[in-house]
UniProtKB/Swiss-Prot annotation:
Gene coding for it: IL12A
Source organism, top-level taxon: Eukaryota
Assembly notes: Heterodimer with IL12B; disulfide-linked. This heterodimer is known as interleukin IL-12. Heterodimer with EBI3/IL27B; not disulfide-linked. This heterodimer is known as interleukin IL-35. Interacts with NBR1; this interaction promotes IL-12 secretion.
Pfam families xref list: IL12 (PF03039)
Lineage, broadest ranks: Eukaryota, Metazoa, Chordata, Craniata, Vertebrata
The protein's name: Interleukin-12 subunit alpha
Organism from which the protein derives: Ovis aries (Sheep)
Length: 221
């Protein structure tokens, strides 16, 4: 992987990390990932699913300040994970040649990469991504439980998105990992819950883009 490509990757990750109000684009069809699917395919499926879910939420909750310009942006992984730093291309961190790789390698149980052997830095990156996914999965499940109690039955989380998160988590296979967070259990205010849904979906879509960029980088390196 040449330095120019790595610099482009990390610039994209930092931009996504600090500019949460990027344009959303059109809804994309959701595909079902099958056996033997790589983590790049899973991450692309996840990005499609969260983009579709966010678009539907914006349409349904048009009177709830659900656009990226109107919401108060929040990152539930802040100070709990460090995906951008953990996924920094090794050559940028060590200033070695464009083919640099750390000698230490680990055997992973997941099937994200073609080989079961991955570098120490790659393992840290994938573990951080797993923690991100687990945090959002827990938060979305708790939020969906609240939405199901709403008498208006106005909006629910798309099960395709929850399934896409679970599929990528299963592929990463860091089941022993714990996350330093419990789902927020605020008062049962359906208006606030719907606004929070918009906030989380916007934040998670940005994180899904970051994950997809990293999986693309890892798959081609």
């Amino acid at each position: 992987m040449c330095p120019l490509r790595s610099l482009l990757l990390i610039s994209t990750l930092v931009l996504l990390h600090h500019l949460p109000h990027l344009s959303l684009g059109r809804s994309l069809p959701t595909t079902t990932a099958g056996p033997g699917t790589s983590c790049l395919d899973y991450s692309q499926n996840l990005l499609r699913a969260v983009s579709n879910t966010l678009q539907k939420a914006r349409q349904t909750l048009e009177f709830y300040s659900c656009t990226s310009e109107e919401i108060d942006h929040e990152d539930i992984t802040k100070d709990k994970t460090s995906t951008v730093e953990a996924c920094l291309p090794l050559e940028l961190a060590t200033n070695e040649s464009c083919l640099a790789s750390r000698e230490t390698s680990l055997i992973t149980n997941g099937h994200c990469l073609s080989s079961g052997k991955t570098s120490f830095m790659t393992t840290l990156c994938l573990r951080s991504i797993y923690k991100d996914l687990k945090m959002y999965h827990m938060e979305f499940q708790a939020m969906n439980a609240k939405l199901l109690m709403d008498p208006k039955r106005q909006v629910f989380l798309d099960q395709n998105m929850l399934a896409a998160i679970a599929e990528l988590m299963q592929a990463l296979n860091f089941d022993s990992e714990t996350v330093p967070q419990k789902p927020s259990l605020e008062e049962l205010d359906f208006y606030k819950t719907k606004v929070k849904l918009c906030i989380l979906l916007h934040a998670f879509r940005i994180r899904a883009v970051t994950i997809d960029r990293m999986m693309s980088y890892l798959s081609s390196s």
